[in-house]
Amino acid sequence: MSVLRPLDKLPGLNTATILLVGTEDALLQQLADSMLKEDCASELKVHLAKSLPLPSSVNRPRIDLIVFVVNLHSKYSLQNTEESLRHVDASFFLGKVCFLATGAGRESHCSIHRHTVVKLAHTYQSPLLYCDLEVEGFRATMAQRLVRVLQICAGHVPGVSALNLLSLLRSSEGPSLEDL
């Protein structure tokens, strides 16, 4: 078990692999199932993990995109994400990591303020997406978006790289933290 690096493994031919990290097993599995239903030109592989580090395995494929799923109803979810981030190499944050906050629709039940997750994403210079994964329609839409982002991060979209995508996502964000 060690730091997860983007170039530890060779890429698979026409394969795109996403790692979903989060404490909500059922929601992660539902999101993974929705992603696998999506139309994808490449072979899509979805791996789930409660936390990092991953056990070192010779058979584990190269990870093209890591999505940290933070449930805003659980402080443990945020703590788990913060601890897992320590096991990710800095070069992964060049467009191959994003945060997904779920549960924002019922703010009265949230134990984590949205601003906390915004600061976390800003600290790691990574995009932050919001989606209520408990709603099937929202989950299906998020699955589509994640599959598209994964294809870009895996290098399967000509003319667009993970860094290009990162700069596009950052420029479409709202005001910076300093402006708030």
Swiss-Prot record:
Disulfide bond positions: none
Keyword Cytoplasm: yes
Record's keyword annotation contains Cytoplasm: yes
Organ and tissue specificity: Isoform 3 is highly expressed in spleen, and intermediately in heart, prostate and ovary. Isoform 3 is highly expressed in resting CD19 B-cells and B-lineage chronic lymphocytic leukemia (B-CLL) cells and weakly expressed in activated B-cells. Isoform 1 is selectively expressed in activated CD19 cells and weakly in resting CD19 B-cells.
Keyword entries, A-Z: Centromere, Chromosome, Cytoplasm, Kinetochore, Nucleus
Subcellular location field: Nucleus; Cytoplasm; Chromosome, Centromere, Kinetochore
GO biological process, any: chromosome segregation
InterPro entries: Centromere_Cenp-M, P-loop_NTPase
GO cellular component terms given for this protein: cytosol; inner kinetochore; nucleoplasm; nucleus
Signal sequence interval, chain numbering: none
Pfam family, one: CENP-M
Subunit and interaction comment: Component of the CENPA-NAC complex, at least composed of CENPA, CENPC, CENPH, CENPM, CENPN, CENPT and CENPU. The CENPA-NAC complex interacts with the CENPA-CAD complex, composed of CENPI, CENPK, CENPL, CENPO, CENPP, CENPQ, CENPR and CENPS.
Function: Component of the CENPA-NAC (nucleosome-associated) complex, a complex that plays a central role in assembly of kinetochore proteins, mitotic progression and chromosome segregation. The CENPA-NAC complex recruits the CENPA-CAD (nucleosome distal) complex and may be involved in incorporation of newly synthesized CENPA into centromeres.
Protein name, per record: Centromere protein M
Species in which this protein is naturally found: Homo sapiens
Gene that specifies this protein: CENPM
